[in-house]
Structure formats: structure tokens, C-alpha cells
Amino acid sequence: MYAVLKSGGRQYEVRPGQVVKVEKLLGEVGDKVTLDQVLLFSDGTDIQVGQPVLANIAVQGQIVEQGRHRKIVIFKHKRRKDYRKKQGHRQHYTAVRVEEIVTLGQ
């Protein structure tokens, strides 16, 4: 059983029990979250594809970490002009443990 969900403009393939790092979500460690932007769902025998999302499927999970990725360095320069600019960035993320993929009331 797996699902493809959209969170923060990116798509993630998730399975129950998996820990996935998504773009920052509001909440504290231990909070329950429901991700309802499910694009595709497969239970092993049948595949459901949303157009664009499935209204009756959601992914439930628990926040296990709020953190920041490693730093990336942005370096710009212009040759022979003594122009150099260095900038760093660390993106925030939320690690979510997928507990189950549920079918909402229908």
C-alpha cells in the first residue's frame, strides 16, 4: 500500500511506517497531522488516480522532528571586477512518520 501526496509544492511517495521530510508544517513534535492532498493511491491490487487530487483519501501521521537541512552556499562573482558575493541558506523541514493511509467517509 502506498500513496503519492503533494506537500509544499513537491510530491512524495509514502508508505505506512515511513518517515518523510516535507516542507515546514506548523505544529510541535508529537502532534498529529493529516495530509489530504493525495494524488495517487494503491492498495496493492487497485490504483486510484486523482484529477488532480483524491477527495476521499488522506494520509495521517505524526511529527517526529522540526529541523533545518544542511547549508547550501550561493556564490556569485564577476571576473576581473573585484565583485564577490557569498550567501548561505538552510531550508526548514518537518519530518513526519506516516501512520496510516485512510479512506474518508463515503
Swiss-Prot record:
The keyword rRNA-binding applies. GO terms for biological process: translation. PROSITE patterns: RIBOSOMAL_L21. GO terms for molecular function: rRNA binding; structural constituent of ribosome. This is Large ribosomal subunit protein bL21. Keywords: Ribonucleoprotein, Ribosomal protein, RNA-binding, rRNA-binding. GO terms for cellular component: cytoplasm; ribonucleoprotein complex; ribosome. Part of the 50S ribosomal subunit. Contacts protein L20. The keyword Ribonucleoprotein applies. It comes from Syntrophobacter fumaroxidans (strain DSM 10017 / MPOB). This protein binds to 23S rRNA in the presence of protein L20. Belongs to the bacterial ribosomal protein bL21 family. The gene is rplU.
